C-alpha cells in the first residue's frame, strides 16, 4: 500500500522500481511521475522525493 507522504525509498520497498519516470524541473523543486505498467497502470507523483498524489488506471 502506497500513501501520500511516502518517500521514494518507501515506494520502491513497497512496489519496486517504476517502469519509467517522467521528470520536470522547476525553479524551486523537482516533480516526478513514476509509471508502473504491470497489470493496471499506476502513476505515483512525487515532489522533491515525497509522494503527493497516486493515480490508478483501469
Where are these regions (language model features)?
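Residues within mature, well-folded domains
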Residues: 1-58
